[in-house]
Regions:
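Alpha-helical transmembrane segments of multi-pass membrane proteins
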Residues: 19-30, 54-59, 103-114, 139-143, ...
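Intrinsically disordered, low-complexity regulatory regions of eukaryotic regulatory proteins
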Residues: 17, 177-180, 202, 308-316
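Cytosolic, intrinsically disordered low-complexity tails and loops
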Residues: 1, 299-322
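Intrinsically disordered, low-complexity regions of eukaryotic proteins
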Residues: 21, 37, 279, 312, ...
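Small-residue-rich transmembrane alpha-helices that serve as helix-helix interface/gating elements
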Residues: 271-283
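Membrane-interfacial loop-to-transmembrane-helix junctions in polytopic alpha-helical membrane proteins
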Residues: 7-14, 43, 88-95, 99, ...
Length: 322
């Protein structure tokens, strides 16, 4: 049993090493390319080269996190069956593998800072649509964030291929990947050479802010995964509600509203993601209503138990007679 579990751990270590390699390649490619855009538009200033230092620290942090992930549960369970068994419980607040969502938070904030600078300094707006390193190439570079999220999720679990845990993780990864790609497409509204639109300054800021918020939001999904041990335990209801509410109010609803506004008043081409926003709103509301009712019911039950407990503490003899 120990030998079989050791082989399983060896195969998992090989897969983890491959994930680390691909993750580092993506981080280096994305970070250095965005740095190239910033440095090229600000030639003569040495300060912009310090972005490479930030990319290096982010890459090293991600590599350390991926290398820190222990062997799969099968190997740990085999050792505990032969040795002294003890339950490995996650931290009640930080959850399992807290550095995973911390690394995404640092990475996404660094990405958001670069994206904001690219658009606030008019670097992205001046790119040619058909140039080799133009608009489409910049979109592809920013969209690499979806690959980073996918590798972070895949590198922190060992779910069986046909298990409910694997189904849940695959669904979450796919949904979050589409959300990130939707944000990149939404940023495309800020390229005047491609859209042939001149947005007002408040609308331009709204598009940029909403897109950047959606780059940070997957950190909450990773935090939710850490709390439920990547699908092994029931998912916290409060976090589920918060995640769905934020997606409705900060992603699907405003994205749909702005796209419909530009389509109706300016004749802008309709993005296929407008259908995704409609489906996201419908599915989000349909899933949110029963969860919200359950959450309110649990809150009322907790309040009732607290009132009963207070009454027992005040007059336990009277309650016993009743």
């Amino acid at each position: 049993m120990r030998a079989m579990a050791a082989r399983c751990c060896s195969a998992s270590s090989l897969a983890t090493a491959l994930d680390v390699l691909v993750l580092l390649v993506v981080l280096v490619f994305q970070g250095s390319t965005l740095d190239f855009y910033l440095i090229r538009s600000n030639e003569g200033s040495v300060a912009w080269y310090f972005w490479f230092l930030a990319d290096f620290l982010s890459g090293e942090f991600s590599r350390a996190i991926q290398s820190w992930v222990p062997c799969p549960p099968a190997f740990v369970q085999a050792q505990r069956e032969e040795d002294a068994p003890q339950e490995d419980c996650p931290h009640p607040v930080w959850g399992r593998f807290p550095l995973c969502y911390v690394s995404w938070l640092l990475y996404s904030l660094l990405l958001v800072a670069k994206v904001v600078l690219l658009f606030r300094l008019d670097v992205a707006q001046l790119l040619e649509e058909n140039a080799r390193y133009g608009v489409q190439f910049l979109k592809a570079v920013v969209a690499a964030a979806a690959v980073v999220f996918l590798l972070l999720v895949e590198g922190h679990h060992d779910a069986a291929s046909q298990s409910e845990q694997r189904t849940y993780l695959r669904s979450l990864s796919t949904g979050t990947t589409f959300e990130l790609l939707d944000s990149v497409t939404f940023l495309g509204l800020l390229f005047p050479n491609e859209t042939h639109l001149t947005l007002t300054y408040p609308l331009e800021n709204a598009v940029l802010a909403l897109a950047c918020v959606n780059f940070v939001l997957p950190g909450l999904a990773l935090f939710k995964l850490s709390q439920c041990e990547y699908g092994l335990r029931p998912r916290p209801l409060g976090l589920k509600l918060l995640y769905k509410l934020l997606h409705l109010s900060l992603v699907n609803v405003p994205y749909l509203a702005i796209r419909v506004y530009l389509w109706g008043f300016f004749g802008h081409d309709v993005s296929l993601f407008i259908v995704k926003n409609l489906l996201g709103i419908y599915a989000g509301i349909r899933a949110l209503v029963p969860d919200l009712r359950l959450y309110c019911f649990l809150l009322s039950e907790r309040g009732a138990r607290k009132r009963v407990g207070d009454a027992e503490a005040r007059d336990p003899i009277e309650l016993k007679v009743m």
